[in-house]
Amino acid sequence: MHLSLGFLSLIALAVIAQDTSIATVKRAFSNANVWIPLIYIPEDISINFNPTALLEVTFPEPGARPITIHAGQQLPRNSTAGPPSFSVRGAASRGPFVVAAVDPDAPTPQDPTSAEIRHFLGGNFVSDGSGLLHNGTAAVSEFLQPTPPAGSDAHRYIFLLFNQPRGFNDQTLVTPTTSISNFDIATFAKAVGLGNPIAGTFMLVAPDS
């Protein structure tokens, strides 16, 4: 199904609201599934998404206020250069956590033969008193700015937060030199013992006009 950018923008505007509760995030995912099947998340990444905390993803904006995305919000590509910062609210512990970001729509939502693209993978995140996550080690995969190709519909970019298991720093399935294409977050999570994500959010980014 081909969806115009204008239609996607209208739906994205409908879900721009303060993510004040887990129910708000789950409702955004659910509403996206009802109205735009292309935006449904858990089925496309084969992972059980039943969050118990809130993940906030904030992009710096030179000369302007940072943008904290709300589940389902569409951002201009030039607002996603990043790297973003992460915060968590409602988590049972202060970490450590693993953060992952994937694009299940590459090269296009209708023909995602390169999906998933791994846009970020990092561990050893711990929360300070305000919930802001800090990381003292290099990411496994540094943040890659969304770059959907010309002519594509908007892509979904999904951010997931996991509790970090012991031994995660010793995993070798994904390294800084591993291809970012055809990544499978569900398979990776199972292989390294991440379990299911405890929080998540997503945004839409369309090609530059």
Enumerate the predicted regions with their spans.
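Cleavable N-terminal signal peptides of Sec/SRP-targeted secreted and luminal proteins
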Residues: H2-A17
